[in-house]
């Protein structure tokens, strides 16, 4: 199988040679940025229809996460066309962030169709650099089908931790790699170099659950889901939530240096994705 992968990758490359040549010459990326929002505007409603009940179950937990303002301050990371707006509870104060400014046209349409929400602003920036958002300013961050295409999931999750208030929650829905060594994983490896160009940087073989485990959340609830479109190579999905920890006792009593605290390795608490 290890020998077969590069041979099949070469075959796919030859079949899609014009695309790879355009990418090499720097012509493909601007074109992709322009057409990708139109592609998502077609695909995301179809995807939502297939996973609607699960999305409603996941995002129903947002309602009880109000902050000091009495409303939920929600950041949608990689907001795309705004396909998730319909699932958010009324009154959320939504900030949208996406590195692709061409999504704004579709966001405006989604905002008009979902007037139960309060929209703050649209920030054009990558998830690795959210400097325009203040520390601890968000009660909730939503990230759906985003960590597959960012340059550094680790840096994105660090930024998520920074903008979340203590006790704030990251809600995620991501596609991940098939089991290592399976035929499905082999085909993901074969298609990935070409798929990254078609899907605006989307990687098929990321083990995103490991990035979440290493991100120092105090609690993680995660559930595995089958892909909504079995004819695509995107593989299984993971959905769930991750809670930002409150300041450690050591940080809270730093003014008392004489007090010695035992160092305990961080381990997130894993719970089934049920209830609120």
Language-model features: locations:
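Short conserved loop adjoining the S-adenosyl-L-methionine
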Residues: 129-135, 151
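N-terminal auxiliary segments of SAM/dcSAM-dependent transferases
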Residues: 1-29
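A short glycine-rich, Lys/Arg-flanked "PGG" loop and its adjoining helix->strand segment in the class I
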Residues: 154-166
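C-terminal alpha-helical "lid/dimerization" subdomain adjacent to the S-adenosyl-L-methionine
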Residues: 22-26, 34-52, 173-236, 241
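Core SAM-dependent methyltransferase catalytic element
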Residues: 215, 222-276
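Class I SAM-dependent methyltransferase SAM/SAH-binding core
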Residues: 73-131
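A short SAM/SAH-binding and catalytic strip from SAM-dependent methyltransferases
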Residues: 139-153
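Conserved alpha-helix/loop element of class I SAM-dependent methyltransferases that forms part
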Residues: 45-73, 83-87
């Amino acid at each position: 199988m290890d020998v077969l992968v590069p041979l099949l990758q070469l075959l796919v490359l030859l079949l899609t040679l014009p695309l790879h040549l355009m990418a090499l010459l720097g012509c493909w990326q601007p074109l992709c940025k322009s057409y990708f929002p139109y592609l998502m505007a077609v695909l995301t409603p179809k995807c939502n229809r297939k996973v609607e009940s699960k999305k409603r179950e996941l995002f129903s937990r947002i309602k009880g996460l109000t902050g000091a303002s009495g409303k939920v301050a929600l950041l949608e990371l990689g907001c795309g066309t705004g396909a998730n707006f319909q699932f958010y509870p009324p009154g959320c104060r939504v900030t949208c962030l996406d590195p692709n400014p061409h999504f704004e046209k579709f966001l405006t349409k989604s905002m008009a169709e979902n007037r139960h929400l309060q929209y703050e602003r649209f920030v054009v920036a990558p998830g690795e650099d959210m400097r325009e958002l203040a520390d601890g300013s968000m009660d909730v961050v939503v990230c759906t089908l985003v960590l597959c295409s960012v340059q550094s999931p680790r840096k994105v999750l660090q930024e998520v931790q920074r903008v979340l208030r203590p006790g704030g929650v990251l809600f995620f829905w991501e596609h991940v790699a098939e089991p290592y060594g399976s035929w499905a994983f082999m085909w993901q490896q074969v298609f990935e170099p070409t798929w990254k160009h078609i899907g605006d940087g989307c990687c098929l073989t990321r083990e995103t659950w490991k990035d979440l485990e290493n991100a120092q959340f105090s609690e993680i609830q995660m559930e595995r889901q089958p892909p909504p479109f079995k004819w695509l190579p995107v593989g299984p999905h993971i959905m769930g939530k991750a809670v930002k920890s409150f300041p450690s006792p050591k940080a809270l009593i730093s003014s008392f240096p004489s007090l010695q605290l035992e160092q305990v390795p961080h381990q997130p608490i894993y719970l089934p994705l049920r209830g609120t």
